[in-house]
């Protein structure tokens, strides 16, 4: 089979790894190679970072007004809209996500660039009302310099966009390192950035493996900020690497999000919300609602109706319009899911649905929608992120118990609440220790809405105005208005 060949984007040029080494990317639906990419090493990282630093210092980028940067971002958003079908098809092939879902994600990506473009010239400083009549002071937001974006395999386009747009709006340059399992659409985004008129070297993309390429990037002394999305184990390596140079960090990590269904909820909507929360994207989402908390009055009915609905999910080729659940993105992740399912069975969780690979003609990495009933929240399947189509359901008696179970987790990324009681919704939204709360909906996103978690789900926020400010340094400037000589040098003014 002929493989599609990709090159890296460094300084506006399409290049191979200096070593000439490559690696294959596998199609998850077929478990077969479909693309060949450069296997970058430390030397390639060095030239990418140096390219970004040179571009940051160049008048072609540094000399642009904020309004001009915003216009470039808006043009990039327009190009994404013009190329949406190509991008959707490419991502579906590369990481196994449903074509229905990739089309949906690509359709709202332009909004992220358009919204952020409008913020580029809104990064206002301020004057300080000093009580010192001979001094004047003001603040200004300035770009940081070279920043790095580490992108996972589950939603590379979306998770690149929410790093790239604010970084450029603030005036930085960037080196992107996508997952070796899903690099194609990030490279395509770099091509569109060049087409939009963004100067060479402002957006660079290097491909390779985390322990080599990623590690070299995160410890590079010229990288002033790292935006990372991924698992906690890798994040710990990133934190240690970045500490060498005190680079700032934004970490969007895992979750074990509670999806709480009260007896007064609209059950039809709640069941669809549960399916969306855990079986969409084959459960490969940081915000997956993998812990289902159901009030005891409706517990049995809800579980039976959820089983009936989930058992009808159509598994198959992600590029088929009728498919509702595609494969896992990697063989390694499929093995992780199978291991956690085995642990759940050994611990006494009751398997109600799935728990195995489906019988399909394809050799891809598919897994059935799976549901466990659990009698305690301390079970491993209730505490560890699966990152697959595996939900665990537990009953609760009242609001207080639901809150206790919801907060009994090392994670705090997202939560869902299904109820008609407005007061209850507000109380739980206030008291649940999670960065995102959805009430009577799930997986809603907007360019205006910050994304990020509490506890072991990371820190920092992406999307919204705060995400752009997070890519700036705040400078304070003092001006002496007096014509008088400097007073006593040993007394602080």
Regions of interest found by a model, annotated:
Residues 125-269, 396:
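Rossmann-like NAD(P) dinucleotide-binding subdomain of oxidoreductase/dehydrogenase enzymes
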Residues 33-40, 57-61, 148-149, 259-262, ...:
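Short, well-ordered beta-strand elements within core beta-sheets of diverse protein domains
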Residues 114-129, 311-315, 346-353, 359, ...:
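Proline-centered turn/helix-capping motifs that create local helix->coil transitions or kinks
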Residues 1-30, 55, 356:
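Hydrophobic face of amphipathic alpha-helices that form TPR/SEL1-like repeat modules
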Residues 225, 233-376, 439, 486-493:
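ALDH superfamily catalytic-core signature
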Residues 31, 69, 91, 113, ...:
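Residue-level signal for inorganic ion chemistry
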Residues 34-123:
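Glycine-rich loop-to-alpha-helix module at the N-terminal edge of alpha/beta enzyme cores
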């Amino acid at each position: 089979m002929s493989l599609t060949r990709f090159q890296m984007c460094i300084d506006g040029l399409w290049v191979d790894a200096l070593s000439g080494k490559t690696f294959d990317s596998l199609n998850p639906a077929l478990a077969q190679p479909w693309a060949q990419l450069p296997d970058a090493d430390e030397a390639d990282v060095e030239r990418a970072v140096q390219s970004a630093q040179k571009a940051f210092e160049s008048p072609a980028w540094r000399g642009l007004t904020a309004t001009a940067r915003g216009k470039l971002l808006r043009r990039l958003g327009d190009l994404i809209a013009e190329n949406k079908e190509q991008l959707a098809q490419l991502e579906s092939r590369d990481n196994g996500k449903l074509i229905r879902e990739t089309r949906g994600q690509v359709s709202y990506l332009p909004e992220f660039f358009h919204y952020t473009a409008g913020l580029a010239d809104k990064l206002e400083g301020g004057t300080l009302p000093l009580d010192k009549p001979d001094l004047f002071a003001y603040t200004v937001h300035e770009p940081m310099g070279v920043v790095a974006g580490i992108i996972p395999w589950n939603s590379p386009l979306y998770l690149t966009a929410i790093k790239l747009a604010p970084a450029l709006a603030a005036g930085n340059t960037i080196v992107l390192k996508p997952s070796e399992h899903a690099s194609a659409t990030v490279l395509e985004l770099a091509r569109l950035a060049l087409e939009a008129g963004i100067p060479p070297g402002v957006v660079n993309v290097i491909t390779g493996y985390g322990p080599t390429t990623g590690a070299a990037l995160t410890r590079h002394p010229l990288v002033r900020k790292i935006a990372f999305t991924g698992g906690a184990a890798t994040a710990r390596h990133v934190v240690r690497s970045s500490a060498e140079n005190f680079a700032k960090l934004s970490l969007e990590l895992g979750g074990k999000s509670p999806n709480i269904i009260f007896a007064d909820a609209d059950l039809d909507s709640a069941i669809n919300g549960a399916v969306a929360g855990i079986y969409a994207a084959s459960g490969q989402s940081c915000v997956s609602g993998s812990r289902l908390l159901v009030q005891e009055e409706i517990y049995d009915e809800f579980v039976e109706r959820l089983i009936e609905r989930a058992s009808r999910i159509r598994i198959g080729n992600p590029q088929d319009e009728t498919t509702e659940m595609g494969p896992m993105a990697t063989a390694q992740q499929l093995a992780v899911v199978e291991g956690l399912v085995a642990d759940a069975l050994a611990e006494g969780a009751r398997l109600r649905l799935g728990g195995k690979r489906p019988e399909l003609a394809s050799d891809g990495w598919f897994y059935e929608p799976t549901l466990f009933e659990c009698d305690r929240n301390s079970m491993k399947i209730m505490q560890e992120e699966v990152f697959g189509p595996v939900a665990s359901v537990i009953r609760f008696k009242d609001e207080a118990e639901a809150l206790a179970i919801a907060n009994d987790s090392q994670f705090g990324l997202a939560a869902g609440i299904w109820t008609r009681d407005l007061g209850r919704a507000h109380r739980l939204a206030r008291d649940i220790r999670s960065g995102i709360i959805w009430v009577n909906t799930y997986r809603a996103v907007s360019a205006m809405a910050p994304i990020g978690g509490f506890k072991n789900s990371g820190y920092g926020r992406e999307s919204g105005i705060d995400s752009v400010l997070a890519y700036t340094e705040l400078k304070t400037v003092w001006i002496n208005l007096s014509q008088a000589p400097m007073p006593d040098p040993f007394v602080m003014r």
